[in-house]
């Protein structure tokens, strides 16, 4: 269930506004909920929160080879717009990474408290929570299985288990990226389908 916020600020999308701690959005959104497949009209109370700390997941698929749920997160936006004293326009265009996560029950991916810096390959404290672009955090948050350039908007994820493609594609993931709108001053990216190999 996607979060209805960029960074859980006291004043949403307001320059310099601090993050709410703990973030109340995580009680009902920003995560994956599990419901019974044989019952209609279920409420939150009837579901189980499977994982948390995910800003907005659109692409997800069950990997039958590893018997695990994988998700593609749409990362946060506007680092420079909201924190111009910390992030340059170029940094804002390149951060944070879009991430592929392998989930287990109870997994925490860290949003809104952290974001993943795909250039440094580190979990960083979000500026809403005292981050300065250098401070690492998220000790209890899981690492992404893979990361991709910022703002590419991964909207589809499919593990290939068929027999039509060459064997090198077997059990790998196809990821459909919607494409970016906010990578200025850099060129926009995305608008493609990528293949992510999986060894095991």
Tell what function each PLM region has.
Residues 2:
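A conserved catalytic-loop motif detector
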Residues 5-45, 54-56, 61-200:
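Beta-propeller domain segments
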């Amino acid at each position: 269930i996607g979060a209805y916020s960029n960074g859980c600020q006291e004043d949403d999308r307001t320059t310099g506004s601090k993050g709410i701690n703990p973030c109340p959005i995580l009680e009902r959104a920003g995560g994956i909920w599990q419901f019974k497949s044989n019952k209609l009209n279920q409420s939150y109370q009837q579901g189980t929160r499977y994982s948390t700390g995910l800003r907005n997941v659109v692409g997800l698929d069950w990997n039958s080879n590893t018997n695990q749920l994988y998700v593609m997160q749409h990362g946060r936006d506007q680092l420079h717009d909201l924190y111009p004293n910390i992030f340059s326009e170029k940094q804002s265009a390149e951060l944070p990474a879009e991430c592929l996560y392998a989930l287990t029950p109870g997994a925490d991916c860290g949003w809104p408290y952290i974001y993943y810096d795909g250039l440094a390959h580190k979990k960083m404290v979000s500026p809403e929570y005292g981050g300065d672009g250098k401070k690492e955090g998220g000790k209890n948050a899981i690492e992404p299985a893979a990361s991709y350039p910022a703002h590419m908007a991964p909207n589809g994820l499919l593990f290939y288990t068929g027999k039509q493609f060459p064997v090198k594609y077997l059990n790998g993931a196809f990821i459909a990226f919607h494409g970016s709108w906010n990578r200025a001053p850099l060129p926009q990216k995305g608008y493609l389908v990528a293949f992510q190999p999986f060894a095991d």
